[in-house]
A protein has these predicted regions:
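A short, polar/charged loop-to-alpha-helix boundary motif
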Residues: 39-49
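Residues that line or immediately flank small-molecule/substrate-binding pockets and catalytic motifs
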Residues: 37, 71, 95
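Short, basic and Ser/Thr-rich N-terminal targeting/leader segments
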Residues: 15-19, 63-65
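Zinc-dependent deaminase
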Residues: 1-11, 78, 82-151
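Small-residue (primarily alanine) positions within well-ordered alpha-helices
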Residues: 4, 8-11, 21, 31, ...
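Short beta->alpha transition motifs characteristic of CBS
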Residues: 30-37
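Short beta-strand scaffold segments in enzyme catalytic cores
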Residues: 19-27
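Helix-adjacent hinge/juxtasegments
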Residues: 41, 52-82, 86
Length: 151
C-alpha cells in the first residue's frame, strides 16, 4: 500500500485526485495506475480501471484470477463492477469513501449473492495516510480557488 500511496502522490502533483491502484500477482506488481480523469477528460479514467486494463494486457487475459488489487480509496460502483467482471478475487483498500464508496460505504457490492463472482475485501490498510493525502489535496484546491476568486 505504501507503493500505491507514493503513486497517488504523483497524481496529486499533476492535478489529479490522488488515488492509485496496484494489481499484484504472486507478490509482483503487474500493473499500476493513478487517476487520469482530469488529464484525459475521461470519466472512466479511474486508477482501478486503468490498472485492470493494463493487467489484462500484461497477462493477455481479462480473467485476473490469482491477483490482488490494492487501492488507496474505496472503489466506486464502476470500479468494483470492473473488479468483479475481471474476476479479481481480493481487494485491499485504504480510506473509505462516504460519498461514492461501493464496498460498504454507500452500498456494498462485493458480497452481492446475485453476482457470479465474489471479491474478498480488506479495508483500512494505511487508511489514515490515504485520507490525509486526499484531504490535503482538496484543501489545497479550495485555497487555490479562493485565491483566484479574490480580486
Amino acid at each position: 500500500m505504501q507503493q500505491a500511496l507514493t503513486l497517488a502522490r504523483s497524481a496529486a502533483s499533476i492535478g489529479e485526485v490522488p488515488i492509485a491502484a496496484l494489481l499484484v500477482r504472486d507478490g509482483i506488481v503487474i500493473a499500476e495506475a493513478h487517476n487520469l480523469r482530469e488529464t484525459k477528460q475521461d470519466p472512466t479514467a479511474h486508477a482501478e480501471v486503468i490498472a485492470i486494463r493494463e493487467g489484462a494486457r500484461q497477462t493477455n487475459s481479462w480473467r485476473l484470477i490469482d491477483t490482488t488489487l490494492y487501492v488507496t480509496l474505496e472503489p466506486c460502483t464502476m470500479c468494483i463492477g470492473a473488479i468483479v467482471l475481471a474476476r479479481i478475487p481480493r481487494l485491499v483498500f485504504g480510506a473509505t469513501d462516504p460519498k461514492a464508496g461501493a464496498c460498504g460505504s454507500i452500498m456494498n457490492i462485493p458480497p452481492e449473492p446475485r453476482l457470479n463472482h465474489r471479491v474478498e475485501v480488506v479495508e483500512g490498510v494505511c487508511a489514515e495516510d490515504s485520507q490525509a493525502l486526499l484531504q490535503d489535496f482538496f484543501r489545497r484546491l479550495r485555497r487555490e480557488s479562493a485565491q483566484r476568486e479574490t480580486p
